[in-house]
Design a protein with these regions (language model features):
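Short S/T/G/P-rich N-terminal loop/turn motif that feeds into the first structured element of a domain
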Residues: 1-77, 83-93, 107-127
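Amphipathic protein-protein interaction modules
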Residues: 88, 96-102
Length: 127
């Protein structure tokens, strides 16, 4: 399936001190495993994931000039896109059933999240 206007997604951005990235990396590995075990790429059983990606990069003093040096933080971006609200709801239900993973997500979000689009519609796509 392709991503189009009206699909629903999440994007969460984190700024993590470099000395705390091991914890975030472990969470990302656990979350990816959860996604692979419980989500579908096709069919009619939700959650059907259209796109799942995680980005990681040093935070630069000037993001347009990598030669400007690093801040001592690492940036993470977690993006998920579903066809509609049914996929989002199925994802949330399954995620909350994994209590330890969900508790870690809540703690990491409370500690390091700088922006979150949760259940937001896609407003532009290469359709």
């Amino acid at each position: 399936m392709s991503i189009k206007r009206g699909n629903i997604g999440f994007h969460v951005s984190f700024v993590v001190p470099n000395d705390a990235t091991e914890r975030m990396d472990q969470f990302i590995a656990t979350h990816e495993q959860f996604m692979r075990e419980s989500h579908h790429l096709s069919g009619d059983q939700e959650p059907i994931i259209l796109s799942y990606s995680v980005f990681k990069s040093p935070e630069f003093n000037n993001p347009f000039d990598p030669n400007s040096g690093e801040t001592g933080n690492t940036l993470y971006g977690l993006t998920e896109i579903y066809s509609g609200p049914e996929g989002v709801q199925a994802h949330m239900t399954l995620g909350q059933q994994r209590e330890a993973m969900f508790a870690e997500l809540v703690d990491l979000t409370n500690t390091y999240c700088v922006a979150g689009l949760l259940g937001a519609p896609v407003i532009a796509a290469m359709e």
